[in-house]
């Protein structure tokens, strides 16, 4: 069980931070327990707020469960970040508005050229940033160490848009140095360490 696994990991000497990346579907059932066993934050995948588009992407009709998971994590006091894959057909504005309403950082991740992504024609985060700037105001790269430390260490480059109160991060898996700052051990859903 995930909670027992995290409890065990927390006891390992040298483990400083445990952050979980999840689709959020079961998070509504475990948010409080995850906080209690020492999870330091959760990154939740949310590629759309449109139920039909969500179904096309995931093959599941579980958008409401994901949204409930986000609420449960926040209620439990877990720091939450939202992740969305930067697909060419993505309309980022509903996600930005949701992040703003929920006061959560939002990160856009370029599509990786593996599996389905090999056949996919994406757009760069630079293009997406320009699209967002047209709606959300001027974008300034965040450089203040104190502000950035709240975002945690990781591959995202954060921007503050003049008309938004939440930061928007961009993880450039293709057009940037995606893994040059990685300092993580990852446990896959299948139980493998990467």
Regions found by a protein language model. Name each.
Residues 100-101, 111-194:
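Auxiliary Fe-S-binding modules of radical SAM enzymes
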């Amino acid at each position: 069980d995930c909670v027992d696994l995290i409890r065990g990991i927390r006891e390992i000497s040298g483990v400083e931070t445990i952050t979980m990346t999840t689709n959020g579907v079961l998070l509504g059932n475990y948010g409080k327990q995850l906080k209690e066993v020492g999870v330091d934050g959760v990154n939740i995948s949310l590629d759309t707020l449109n139920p039909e588009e969500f179904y096309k992407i995931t093959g599941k009709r579980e958008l409401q469960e994901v949204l409930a998971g986000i609420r449960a994590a926040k209620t439990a006091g877990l720091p939450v970040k939202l992740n969305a894959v930067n697909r060419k057909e993505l309309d980022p504005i509903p996600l930005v508005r949701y992040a703003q309403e929920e006061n959560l950082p939002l990160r856009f991740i370029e599509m990786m050229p593996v599996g389905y992504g090999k056949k996919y024609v994406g757009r760069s985060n630079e293009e997406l940033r320009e699209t967002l700037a047209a709606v959300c105001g001027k974008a300034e790269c965040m450089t203040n160490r104190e502000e950035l430390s709240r975002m945690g260490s990781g591959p995202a480059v954060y921007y503050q848009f003049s008309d938004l109160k939440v930061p928007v991060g961009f993880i450039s898996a293709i057009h940037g140095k995606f893994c040059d700052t990685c300092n993580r051990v990852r446990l896959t859903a299948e139980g493998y360490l990467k």
